Amino acid sequence: MGFVDLHTHSDASDGSFTPAQLVHLAKEAGLCAIALTDHDTTAGIADAIDAGNELGVEIVPGIEVSGNYEGHEIHILGLFIHPDDPKLEAFLKDMRSRRNRRNEEIFRRLAADGITFTDEELFGSNPQTVITRAHVARAMVQKGICSSVNQAFKKYLEYGGRYCPPKEETEPEAIVKILLENGAFAALAHPFLYKLGDKKTQALITRLADAGMQGLEVYHSSNYPLESRKLQKMAAGLKLLPTGGSDFHGSCKPDISIGTGRGGLRVSNLLLEDIRHCVCPKSGMET
């Protein structure tokens, strides 16, 4: 049995490694496949696939998109996306525009308190990256404003806080719909990170399942064993396929390793095969 990681990020969004470097890390970790699930962009997928072909690591083209649920930002993963789909790209372009408008407001609020950044501090070595709160947090650490990325998030970048207004709302059903129309597999990412409580978490998952969502991220670096067991039960009750991944970012989340998370995560390639058959029921069909 092989192992996979179906939730990773590159420097096309808020990861610190290039797509090719990410694939090299996956190879070194002994993984047979990874999904590249950058925020609101498919820009890194082609480079990841090229590196995967060279190294013998399967690359599942993916995406992570943010929506809103009762005042909380939630994330939905798309796996086996078709990145060249014009309708998907138009949707992601709109999502990036919404993100950029929020970024501008974050920068305005921080500047009012004397905190400013250069483009080099934010973009690093990739001028095409999708700027996220993680980029701002890393820049704060580099400037000595905060001692860690976690401190920057807690003090300045908490969702809905003084410096970080919510993004313009996107209904999660709209995200599921665009992913299904694309032929992708849609799954709610890290359900317990939203701190909704069991009842509201179940309600959210049920609502998205009713909208056609096929999966649930049952295994994640942030989960305690009890949480994974609860999610297993929720997924089974709604006939959702489980997925799992580390949510690897590199330096933004230095305690998380690709493939193993904080040390106890292992995702079987059998989960990947179930997902593959869900979106491509005919064996051998290209994704």
Where are these regions (language model features)?
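An N-terminally biased module of ancient metal coordination in phosphate/nucleic-acid-related enzymes
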Residues: 1-72, 156-159, 170-183, 187-253
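Extended substrate/RNA-proximal surfaces in nucleic-acid metabolism proteins
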Residues: 54-206, 262-286
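C-terminal active-site subregion of NodB/CE4 polysaccharide deacetylases
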Residues: 239-245, 250-276
